[in-house]
Regions:
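P-loop NTPase switch module centered on the Walker A-proximal segment
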Residues: 1-77, 121, 192-195
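Accessory interaction regions appended to the cores of large information-processing enzymes
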Residues: 137-139, 159, 163-171, 175, ...
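Alpha-helical scaffold elements adjacent to nucleotide-binding pockets in ATP/GTP-utilizing enzyme cores
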Residues: 2-3, 40, 62-65, 69, ...
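Conserved Switch II/interswitch segment of TRAFAC-class P-loop GTPases
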Residues: 46-48, 53-60, 67-91, 95-117
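Gly-rich Lys/Arg/Thr-decorated short loops/hinges at beta-loop-alpha junctions or inter-strand turns
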Residues: 20, 44-48, 68-74, 103, ...
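Canonical P-loop GTPase G-domain recognition
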Residues: 100, 109-173
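Active-site glycine-centered loops adjacent to acidic/histidine catalytic or metal-binding residues
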Residues: 106, 144, 343
Length: 586
């Protein structure tokens, strides 16, 4: 935000939201970056192109594509926390491409900041990732983004970001592409966007040559086959937070091009005389899969406007076009689709986006994808970094290394009464752990995870222990009935909620599932009662968020997602059919 402000990208009276680059609603709500977004600023006659990338490995597909567009990286590290696991993920990708980093220690004005320790940890991180001597000789800056200053010295003048701009201009090499202006035009498409007036927009960095609006170009797929030839209708460049049309794009520029119908991400846009496609960065394979099905519950179609499988399929295909990290396959029945992706967070974001667009879906429990390596079954293992108060470290280690089949690799004091725990845990063991972790640490723990390696299958991991309370009737729940059911377990619904047969209304206090009737009213007689009736006071029901609900269910259960509600249900609503299927699966 401050780089944009201090470079004069905004008018003086322009109102700018905080975290201006996180333009998507979900990014603003969750405070994370999901999509990689380019911008550019002008500094003393030099144009600096900036690409903001996500840190979470779930959105790693965004990072891997974008790195081919830049010549250097600025790594922002919290001076109190030091480098986090997701820092490691993005940094490893950048170092592997030979990019030279600038390390900026942010938030040095926080009371618990330890910039020297954070700097040592950065150096150790780079060394462990196999950085070259040139990369290890990185310049460091101390900064406070909120106050809008950066200095080379910790006790510098603390005025503005001039020093950072100067360092970027001096340290990051100019694009090597600029020397290839006279060659034929070539560009690799890294992101796909959509503009309501112009249509599809492909963004990338011009590798060589120049491009004028109105020129005819062709699209090549990764293997070099021609997809289509098209006329470039518009060229847009990023200036501050807006895109502005330009007439000519030169080698080294980051631009968006309109006019093509079929060319997509990782394809090359080239001059008609070029025959070879450009090399695209390989993308890490998906690790989990979730089944998206039509909502076939009795309440289907009440909230959403998109309920047919055809519409859901088209929307998922459109998503796969712009998001290279997910893969979609049809299931034999035709009314469900398997979506493979990087992690629960990425799936949660996709479902949340679709739900806001008015879709109704039924979602299955996430399954981990296995891989055969040399005839042995392997599964994805993640590195988990946890910061917790000392008193909770025991229960966290016990949970991770016990039933969840993890192995503890490091444990050290993190200062201020906290412990840092690093463990390698199979992805299967982490499904649904976030909620349990928050309960165990009373909401004080911080958990970060990143893909580590494929490792031999670690054996069975038990699912949820408690059974569920299943409604045996359809209608609206009655407070009196719920009040009587409270001794049986915790409720997920309140009074006057719409329910149907086979819907899960609560968690049973024992291990078996129990069918209950939440519609049972009080029997009234014409005999006057001697005492007064007890007033019905219900305990507040547990409300599960979308991610919690998806992690909570077992394999024979589904989450029904509509624009206004998230409900849990059994896969087979009829109790006789449930018994039959349970027998068949034994």
């Amino acid at each position: 935000d401050e780089l944009l402000k201090q470079s004069g990208a905004f008018r003086e009276n322009q109102a700018v939201a905080e975290r201006a680059m996180d333009s998507n609603d979900l990014e603003r709500e969750r405070g994370i970056t999901i999509f990689a977004k380019p911008t550019s600023v002008e500094w003393n006659g030099t144009r600096i192109n900036i690409v903001d990338t996500p840190g979470h490995a779930d959105f790693g597909g965004e990072v891997e594509r974008i790195l081919s567009m830049v010549d250097g990286v600025v790594l922002l590290v919290d001076a109190a926390e030091g480098p986090m696991p997701q820092t490691k993920f993005v940094t490893s990708k950048a170092l592997a491409l030979g990019l030279r980093p600038i390390v900026v220690l942010n938030k040095v004005d926080k009371p618990d900041a330890e910039p020297d320790r954070a700097l040592d940890e950065c150096f150790d991180l780079f060394a462990s990732l196999g950085a070259s001597d040139e990369q290890l000789d990185f310049p460091t800056m101390y900064a406070s983004g909120r106050s809008g200053w950066a200095d080379m010295e910790l006790d510098g003048p603390r005025k503005d970001l001039t020093a950072l701009f100067d360092l970027i201009v001096e340290h990051v090499p100019a694009p090597a592409q600029q020397e290839r202006k006279d060659e034929p035009f070539r560009m690799l498409a890294t992101t796909l966007g959509h503009d309501p007036f112009i249509g599809r927009l492909l963004t990338g960095r011009v590798e060589s040559g120049t491009l004028k609006a109105g020129a005819t170009m062709k699209g090549l797929s990764r293997d070099g086959t021609q997809i289509e030839s098209f006329r470039v209708t518009k060229i847009m460049a990023f200036r501050g937070l807006t895109q502005q049309p330009i007439d000519v794009a030169e080698a080294g520029d980051i631009v968006s091009i309109a006019g093509m119908a079929k060319v997509t991400v990782a394809d090359s846009i080239v001059d008609p005389e070029v025959t070879e496609a450009m090399e695209a960065q390989p993308i890490d394979p998906p690790t989990i899969t979730v089944t998206f099905g039509i909502n076939d519950s009795p309440l289907a179609g009440r909230d959403g406007k998109h309920v047919q499988s055809r519409v859901i399929r088209n929307r998922l295909m459109k998503e796969a076009e712009t998001n290279v990290a997910i893969r979609i396959t049809d299931t034999p029945g035709g009314d469900a689709f398997e979506v493979a992706g990087r992690g629960e967070l990425q799936m949660g974001v996709l479902i949340e986006n679709m739900r806001r667009e008015g879709f109704e879906l039924s979602i299955s429990r996430p399954q981990v994808l296995f891989r055969d390596i040399d005839g042995e079954r392997n599964e994805p293992v993640e590195e988990v970094t946890i910061d917790v108060d000392d008193e909770y470290s025991g229960v966290v280690i016990e949970k991770l290394t016990g039933v969840r089949r993890g192995s503890l690799t490091e444990m050290k004091p993190a200062g201020a009464g906290k412990t840092r725990i690093i463990a390698h845990v199979p992805s299967r063991g982490l499904i649904g752990y976030q909620g349990e972790f928050m309960t165990d640490t009373r909401g004080t723990g911080v958990l970060n995870r990143v893909f580590h390696e494929w490792a031999p299958y670690k054996g069975k991991i038990p699912g949820r222990r408690a059974g569920v309370l299943i409604s045996m009737e359809s209608g609206q729940s009655v407070a009196f009935a719920l009040w009587n059911l409270e001794e049986r377990g915790k409720m997920f619904i309140g009074a006057q909620a719409d329910i149907y047969q086979g819907m899960i209304i609560g968690e049973h206090s024992r291990e078996n599932d129990l069918e209950v009737n939440p519609l049972k009213g009080k029997k009234l007689t014409n005999v006057r009662a001697s005492g007064t009736d007890d007033a019905v006071r219900l305990t507040t029901p547990i409300t599960l968020s979308l991610e919690e609900a998806i992690a909570y269910i077992n394999d024979d259960e589904l989450v029904e997602v509509t624009p206004s509600s998230v409900r849990l249900r059994k896969r087979y609503l009829d109790p006789h059919e449930r018994k039959r299927m349970a027998k068949a699966n034994q």
